[in-house]
Amino acid sequence: MKFSMLSLLLAMLIYFCVGHSLAQTGLTDDVDSQSESMADVMNYFPMTNGVGTAGQPTPAQFALIKAAKYSAVINLAVAQSVNALPNEAKIVTDLDMSYQHIPVPWDAPTASHVKEFFETMDMLRHQASPVLVHCAANYRASVFTYKYLTLRQGLSKEEATTPLLKEWLPQMDDNWKAIMALSLNDIE
């Protein structure tokens, strides 16, 4: 688990350092002019019922998210995440999408965080808003979305499990196992 998380954090750091270096030199113009798709958004996975999950999108990828018909974004990452965008709320709302930030500490997720997420999802789903849920790498987003889709929407475990969550389950630490074990009564 530690090796996997360290590898993931190192990969994200390299990705964003290289991207920042390219932006400084102006070499991203050629990259940005190439056609990107939702598949280019880190760990993107479209779920059922107008819900998708992802890792941290780049500023330019939020336009792709809008073009993919998502009208709301929920960010579960903390502001101190290595790849966080300090102006993400403005980027998203400037594209006429709604933005909700529910910072969930990686090492201390709680039932209260899940409850706030459920309430936000209920509000957005009541408005028939397709929602993209993201965090730094799609781990938090996958767990919270899984809980919502199984407990609130009645989807099967198979339908609600992202490929990333399936891979992570055997390595998950006790904090996240506790979140996975929550019942609806524990959350409400």
Model-based region annotation:
Residues 7-17:
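Bacterial N-terminal signal peptides
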Residues 21-131, 146-188:
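Cys-dependent protein tyrosine phosphatase-like superfamily
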Residues 131-142:
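A phosphate-binding catalytic loop at a beta-strand-loop-alpha-helix junction
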Residues 1-7:
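Positively charged n-region of N-terminal signal peptides that target proteins for export
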